[in-house]
Structures are given as C-alpha cells and as structure tokens.
Amino acid sequence: MKQKGFSRKSSLLKEIDFYLVTDSGLSMKGTLSDVRDAVESGCRIVQYREKDKSTKEMVEEASEIKRICSGRAIFLVNDRIDVALAVDADGVHIGQDDMPVETARKLLGEDKIIGLSVNDREEAVLAEKLGADYVGLGPIFDTATKKDAGEGIGPLKIREVKDAIKLPVVAIGGINKENCESVIQNGADSLVAISAVVCSNDVKREAKYFIDMIRRTRKA
C-alpha cells in the first residue's frame, strides 16, 4: 500500500543526501542533461529552478524532468507552484518573499513536499510551525550564484538550527569540495553545491563525489 501524507514525505526526505538545484545560466550541458546525469549518479532530490524561460517552456522542461526523476528522485519546482501543479511534481521550494507556506499547502495538498528557505534559527522554527517539510538553510558561505543571498552565516549555524527543529536541514550557499565536509559534520542532512556541479563537464562524476562524501562523513 502506498503511504500518503506526512509519513510518506518523511520517509522520502530521510533518504536524501546530495540535492541538485538546476541553473541553466551556469550549466555546461543544459538542464536536462544535468538532471539525467545527477540522477544516474544516485542523486535522490532535484529542484528545477528556472528564471528566464516562459511558462510554456518551463512546463515542457519540467515534464521531462519529472519523467527522468520518476521512481528515482524527489522532484521539486522552485517558486512556481503553477508549474508544479501542471506537471504534478512532488512539491515546491519557496523563499521568504514568495507565496506563504499556508497558501502553498492549500493549493498543493498535504501529500506534496514544501521546502522553505531560511537564514537563521528563528526563521527555521517558524517554518516548522507553518508546516514546511524541510528547510533550506543559507547561505552557509559567501556565494556568487544567488546575488541577493547575503553574507555567509558559517557552518556552525547549521547545528544551531538542527538542534531547534525536527525538520531535515538542507545547507546551501557557497558549498564546494573544500568546505563540504564541515557542512555535514555540523549536522546538515543534505547539501546543495550548484556551481561545483553544473559548471562541470562531468556532472555525474561531481554529483557522485558529493554523494560519497556525505555518506562517508555521516558514518565517521
């Protein structure tokens, strides 16, 4: 019997490690190629983030991403709840200035996953109260990928947030091969490393590096 609601979402989110966020502006081979390679490497969660294409183009691309992820990875859409609904994605990731979590939940239903970007402990605690399923905490380090992200908060803040909530914590912002272990050591359940992966000619290799690092560091 297929699980529904909270128990199903919780079990899915417990399985994530490396979290792919797409970026067509940085990608060397294109969004679909990046998703395909990351999923084949073992990535179990993908967020489709696209700021420059029309809604029609996004729906078409999101439909293909859903097909690639089907049965292998959680598929979320960044911000665009209309696109997520159109392709029946597994959920959305929204920011502090986007649609409120409560409104998104009414539109998507209880079975869908909603992630919320947070910058500190207070925002994370509120996210949990509002019904988010996980938080994206950052920027952990200074990053050029998201120009309005602000200064890095540092990996020690991960533990502070992790100790305050029961939700999975996904670390994002300026994460690369040199600093990624500190992110997991400080309690992050998953991490995003956009430029370190999609700027590569071998996305599969780079995604696998982070997957292996996360699993190895968890066991240490």
UniProtKB/Swiss-Prot annotation:
Cofactor(s) named in the record: Mg(2+)
Swiss-Prot/TrEMBL catalytic activity: 2-[(2R,5Z)-2-carboxy-4-methylthiazol-5(2H)-ylidene]ethyl phosphate + 4-amino-2-methyl-5-(diphosphooxymethyl)pyrimidine + 2 H(+) = thiamine phosphate + CO2 + diphosphate; 2-(2-carboxy-4-methylthiazol-5-yl)ethyl phosphate + 4-amino-2-methyl-5-(diphosphooxymethyl)pyrimidine + 2 H(+) = thiamine phosphate + CO2 + diphosphate; 4-methyl-5-(2-phosphooxyethyl)-thiazole + 4-amino-2-methyl-5-(diphosphooxymethyl)pyrimidine + H(+) = thiamine phosphate + diphosphate
Cofactor info, note text: Binds 1 Mg(2+) ion per subunit.
Top-tier EC class: transferase
Keyword Acetylation: no
Pathway: Cofactor biosynthesis; thiamine diphosphate biosynthesis; thiamine phosphate from 4-amino-2-methyl-5-diphosphomethylpyrimidine and 4-methyl-5-(2-phosphoethyl)-thiazole: step 1/1
EC number: 2.5.1.3
Gene Ontology BP term (one): thiamine diphosphate biosynthetic process
Protein keywords: Magnesium, Metal-binding, Thiamine biosynthesis, Transferase
Positions with a binding annotation for 2-[(2R,5Z)-2-carboxy-4-methylthiazol-5(2H)-ylidene]ethyl phosphate: T143, A144, T145, G174, I194, S195
GO molecular function: magnesium ion binding; thiamine-phosphate diphosphorylase activity
Superkingdom of origin: Archaea
Residue stretches in coiled coil: none
One Pfam family linked to the record: TMP-TENI
Positions bound to Mg(2+): D79, D98
GO CC, any one term: cytoplasm
Binding positions (4-amino-2-methyl-5-(diphosphooxymethyl)pyrimidine): Q47, Y48, R49, E50, K51, N78, S117, K146
Function: Condenses 4-methyl-5-(beta-hydroxyethyl)thiazole monophosphate (THZ-P) and 2-methyl-4-amino-5-hydroxymethyl pyrimidine pyrophosphate (HMP-PP) to form thiamine monophosphate (TMP).
Family (UniProt): Belongs to the thiamine-phosphate synthase family.
Record's protein name: Thiamine-phosphate synthase
Lineage of origin: Archaea, Methanobacteriati, Methanobacteriota, Stenosarchaea group, Methanomicrobia
Encoding gene (name): thiE
